[in-house]
Amino acid sequence: MGKGGNQGEGAAEREVPMPTFSWEEIQKHNLRTDRWLVIDRKVYNITKWSTQHPGGQRVIGHYAGEDATDAFRAFHPDLKFVGKFLKPLLIGELAPEEPSQDHGKNSKIIEDFRALKKTAEDMNLFKTNHVFFLLLLAHIIALESIAWFTVFYFGNGWIPTLITAFVLATSQAQAGWLQHDYGHLSVYRKPKWNHLVHKFVIGHLKGASANWWNHRHFQHHAKPNIFHKDPDVNMLHVFVLGEWQPIEYGKKKLKYLPYNHQHEYFFLIGPPLLIPMYFQYQIIMTMIVHKNWVDLAWAISYYIRFFVTYIPFYGILGALLFLNFIRFLESHWFVWVTQMNHIVMEIDQEAYRDWFSSQLTATCNVEQSFFNDWFSGHLNFQIEHHLFPTMPRHNLHKIAPLVKSLCAKHGIEYQEKPLLRALLDIIRSLRKSGKLWLDAYLHK
């Protein structure tokens, strides 16, 4: 803190004391029309600027009234670059007597996690092996080539068509994991190169939208398994998840579907329909409504390429049915892999945990093997990925032992399962939540 005024000619202008705030005051500013947050004890008013936030206003708004230091560091690999956007938003700092953390968060866990991240940086675990990602892209292109050659050489009979569909579904699933890498800025040092290649992979190779994915997925990472903040647990009344939601639905006598049978109808409307119906419709509408013309152009380039390639073999209607069959196959792969790490964990309302604890509560791992790594796009290391979202996936296994040690030190459970058990736990979790709903519906 400096003092005001000058002391004669040539004297340096002294700093004006910065306003200080208590957590009680900061936590009042957590509304859509009034948003403050804290980063490294500095208080920022993001109310107006949040609409310009590249990651979307929702993800940054989820931290209104809270300390966002670790989330800010996790999402932004170039802190110096993004820091310049914060300067005009600075309105003060935490009062000296205030702790650095809000809601009584465990400062020791926070300190140890930050030390762990520094260790990861010292081990060069945020450094990319570009050959690894080039090989991933090459094998996706190779799969697409094999698919075309199969139908070209063997014709459009049922067997060649099924083989081609499964090969293309595999390439789509793998492209989904690859776009995830670029979307998290985990490949190139410069964000703009990640953004450009992300649009190519998700747009031209998959026909989807980078902006749609960013705004949805970053919310999931910021507040995993938190109702009204994580869009991945917004099931549109089709399923009830965790323990809190089914009991609330039961008490309120909400019965949009027979939730006590959700572990059974999951097989009919979960894996088969998410991508070909819900995501495909939502992505197209989002690009049009929000005027994401660049994303739309990339997506159109995918559809042009697909139909130019396969209409000669199947005709227009046949190619359209073929496309949706591929989406149908890919959807099964995507749903089972993405749900095995989260849906089985705690799903609840906001509990205001520190970054490390919140990610461990909402995520679990699947055992490592060459197949598991490839099949899941290394999302079998979901814990490490959530803790360090910008870390290249080929390094996640290297930091895992240190994460386990930190969990053991603080008595936090580190869950790791065989692949088959992880998949079966999805059904067990849905069955458990369904029973909770039925009990509350009948007796509370």
UniProtKB/Swiss-Prot annotation:
- EC number in record: 1.14.19.3
Chemical reaction(s) catalysed: (9Z,12Z)-octadecadienoyl-CoA + 2 Fe(II)-[cytochrome b5] + O2 + 2 H(+) = (6Z,9Z,12Z)-octadecatrienoyl-CoA + 2 Fe(III)-[cytochrome b5] + 2 H2O; (9Z,12Z,15Z)-octadecatrienoyl-CoA + 2 Fe(II)-[cytochrome b5] + O2 + 2 H(+) = (6Z,9Z,12Z,15Z)-octadecatetraenoyl-CoA + 2 Fe(III)-[cytochrome b5] + 2 H2O; (9Z,12Z,15Z,18Z,21Z)-tetracosapentaenoyl-CoA + 2 Fe(II)-[cytochrome b5] + O2 + 2 H(+) = (6Z,9Z,12Z,15Z,18Z,21Z)-tetracosahexaenoyl-CoA + 2 Fe(III)-[cytochrome b5] + 2 H2O; (11E)-octadecenoyl-CoA + 2 Fe(II)-[cytochrome b5] + O2 + 2 H(+) = (6Z,11E)-octadecadienoyl-CoA + 2 Fe(III)-[cytochrome b5] + 2 H2O
Q: Which residues lie on this side of the membrane: Cytoplasmic?
A: 1-131, 179-264, 327-444
Q: Which residues lie on this side of the membrane: Lumenal?
A: 153-157, 286-305
Q: Which GO terms describe its biological process?
A: alpha-linolenic acid metabolic process; fatty acid derivative biosynthetic process; linoleic acid metabolic process; long-chain fatty acid biosynthetic process; unsaturated fatty acid biosynthetic process
The protein's matches in InterPro entries, at most eight in alphabetical order, are given as: Cyt_B5-like_heme/steroid-bd (IPR001199), Cyt_B5-like_heme/steroid_sf (IPR036400), FA_desaturase_dom (IPR005804), Fatty_acid_desaturase (IPR012171)
User: Which keywords does this Swiss-Prot/TrEMBL entry list?
Assistant: Electron transport, Endoplasmic reticulum, Fatty acid biosynthesis, Fatty acid metabolism, Lipid biosynthesis, Lipid metabolism, Membrane, Oxidoreductase, Transmembrane, Transmembrane helix, Transport
Name the Gene Ontology molecular function terms of this record. Answer: acyl-CoA 6-desaturase activity; stearoyl-CoA 9-desaturase activity
State if Hydrolase is listed as a keyword.
Answer: no
Q: What does the record give as its pathway?
A: Lipid metabolism; polyunsaturated fatty acid biosynthesis
How this chain sits in the membrane, per its record, is: Multi-pass membrane protein
> Residue numbers of motif Histidine box-3?
382-386
- Please give the chief subcellular localization of this protein: endoplasmic reticulum
Span-the-membrane segments of this chain are 132-152, 158-178, 265-285, 306-326
Q: Where is the Cytochrome b5 heme-binding domain?
A: 18-95
Single GO cellular component term: endoplasmic reticulum membrane
Name the residue ranges of motif: Histidine box-2.
217-221
Motif span (Histidine box-1)? 180-184
Q: Where does the record say this protein resides?
A: Endoplasmic reticulum membrane
Q: Which family does it belong to?
A: Belongs to the fatty acid desaturase type 1 family.
Q: What does this protein do?
A: Involved in the biosynthesis of highly unsaturated fatty acids (HUFA) from the essential polyunsaturated fatty acids (PUFA) linoleic acid (LA) (18:2n-6) and alpha-linolenic acid (ALA) (18:3n-3) precursors, acting as a fatty acyl-coenzyme A (CoA) desaturase that introduces a cis double bond at carbon 6 of the fatty acyl chain. Catalyzes the first and rate limiting step in this pathway which is the desaturation of LA (18:2n-6) and ALA (18:3n-3) into gamma-linoleate (GLA) (18:3n-6) and stearidonate (18:4n-3), respectively.
The protein's name is: Acyl-CoA 6-desaturase
Q: Which organism is it from?
A: Papio anubis (Olive baboon)
Q: Which gene encodes it?
A: FADS2
